[in-house]
Amino acid sequence: MNQNWNAEKYTSDFSFVHNYGNDVLGLIDTTGVKDVLDLGCGNGALTNTLADKGFSVVGMDASEEMLEIARNNYPGISFIRSDAVDFALEKPVDVVFSNAVFHWIDKADQPRMLECVYRALKSGGQFVFEMGGIGNNILIHSALADLFREYGYTYKMPFYFPSVGEYAGMLEAVGFQVRFAVLFDRPTKLKGENGLSDWINMFV
């Protein structure tokens, strides 16, 4: 993945990330679902919501700083450290859930990650996730690229924002059947007069 996290600031100032993820939880078909993996669980907020719904849930993240917060806040939940592009479960699960994670993973690593997810699921299991898509924050990244160029530097885009068609093709190549996928606008109001600079410092 592309990011070293300030886990405490992320938790205190950017709660909108996991708050938006609550809507994604509603896409899970709960019929017969028992075991859930929250892939890229971060501070564990949505992992806890899944547990509150009665699922047996495990949170997985590559950031030890994030996992420390998750374990402190939700000691009754199992959290394990592993990279999304190279993980394996002892037993497959009914659902792999993920919120606001996959756009952090380089395009070249996406197929390997999706293969890990596919192997982690029981036959007929569900893969329910949200990620940034094509055009996301394009004005910010264009402005940063112009600014870097003005000073003689090249701006390296830190995210992978695919189209629905591109990503559906990746999923199908691994073996998934895509039942529902949508690209939508989601304006986010940032906090305070330094909201944009704080966002850039955290995520870029």
Whereabouts are the PLM-identified features?
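A short SAM/SAH-binding and catalytic strip from SAM-dependent methyltransferases
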Residues: 95-109
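A short acidic, Gly/Pro-enriched loop at the edge of an enzyme's catalytic core
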Residues: 88-96
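C-terminal helical/coil "lid" or tail adjacent to the Rossmann-like core of SAM-dependent
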Residues: 179-204
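Short alpha-helix
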Residues: 160-174
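A short glycine-rich, Lys/Arg-flanked "PGG" loop and its adjoining helix->strand segment in the class I
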Residues: 111-126
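Conserved class I S-adenosyl-L-methionine
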Residues: 1-34, 45, 49, 128-150
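Class I SAM-dependent methyltransferase SAM/SAH-binding core
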Residues: 37-39, 43-86
